[in-house]
Amino acid sequence: MILYPAIDLKEGHCVRLLQGDMQKATIFNDDPAAQAAAFEAQGFTALHVVDLDGAFAGKPMNAAAVDAILARVKMSVQLGGGIRDEATIEAWLGKGIARVIIGTAAVRDPDLVRRAAARFPGKIAVGIDAKDGFVAVEGWAKTAQLSAVELGKKFEDAGVAALIYTDIARDGGLTGLNIDATLALAKAVHIPVIASGGLASLADIERLTAPDCAILAGAISGRALYDGRIDPAKALALLRKD
């Protein structure tokens, strides 16, 4: 299982939000590239980056910060936020992004996901962000009448590389992953599922090593890594033993 440290970008800064609220942003680093390099030095091999401003604007808004990250690290970088058309997907992949995450557009334009997955095999993930079980879009500002499982099943035969499931109520709250909902999605589809939202402690990491979580492909951690609740070396060692 891969543990992805998260870098959320807002106005060029590395921040963490609480439940996706842009008014509840805490700046953790003014230099996202330096933060990425620090994660790489700690032993992480893959990075999860979100352009928060882009998620609301519907187009990339933190390109300079992402470019700086790509120039600084060798680790694999997956990127989401404001990726709503093939031209943007192609541009990011051309710059060296390993995998792009399509969120809002996966709900609004499912065919975009299918076209992109066919054109860029292994490079397309779908971000499923759920609020009370239903998918949220446009920076989590709106909720669609579609469940997480229903959305995941739409792409069962599309060749999508991964589904990234985030429980919005837990995101940034350090209350633990929503294991039940994440596993329900993973059992309903044949696409690898990555868990996100609420990872808070080494106990949560240990929970991910349990047999029932073997079907999960990875997990994303943000605030708990920044404030020291999760020791990177211990977390990575636990997952290596898994």
UniProtKB/Swiss-Prot annotation:
Superkingdom to which the source organism belongs: Bacteria
Record-listed E.C. numbers: 5.3.1.16
One of the record's GO molecular function terms: 1-(5-phosphoribosyl)-5-[(5-phosphoribosylamino)methylideneamino]imidazole-4-carboxamide isomerase activity
Pfam families for the chain: His_biosynth
Main location group: cytoplasm
Subcellular localization: Cytoplasm
Pathway(s) served: Amino-acid biosynthesis; L-histidine biosynthesis; L-histidine from 5-phospho-alpha-D-ribose 1-diphosphate: step 4/9
Reactions accelerated catalytically: 1-(5-phospho-beta-D-ribosyl)-5-[(5-phospho-beta-D-ribosylamino)methylideneamino]imidazole-4-carboxamide = 5-[(5-phospho-1-deoxy-D-ribulos-1-ylimino)methylamino]-1-(5-phospho-beta-D-ribosyl)imidazole-4-carboxamide
Keywords from the UniProt entry: Amino-acid biosynthesis, Cytoplasm, Histidine biosynthesis, Isomerase
One example of a Gene Ontology biological process annotation: L-histidine biosynthetic process
Keyword Amino-acid biosynthesis: yes
Annotated GO CC locations: cytoplasm
Active-site annotation: D8 (proton acceptor), D129 (proton donor)
Alphabetical list of SUPFAM superfamilies matching this protein: Ribulose-phoshate binding barrel
The keyword Transferase is annotated on this UniProt entry: no
Family: Belongs to the HisA/HisF family.
Cross-referenced PANTHER family: 1-(5-PHOSPHORIBOSYL)-5-[(5-PHOSPHORIBOSYLAMINO)METHYLIDENEAMINO] IMIDAZOLE-4-CARBOXAMIDE ISOMERASE (PTHR43090:SF2)
Name by which UniProt lists this protein: 1-(5-phosphoribosyl)-5-[(5-phosphoribosylamino)methylideneamino] imidazole-4-carboxamide isomerase
Species this chain originates from: Beijerinckia indica subsp. indica (strain ATCC 9039 / DSM 1715 / NCIMB 8712)
Gene encoding the protein: hisA
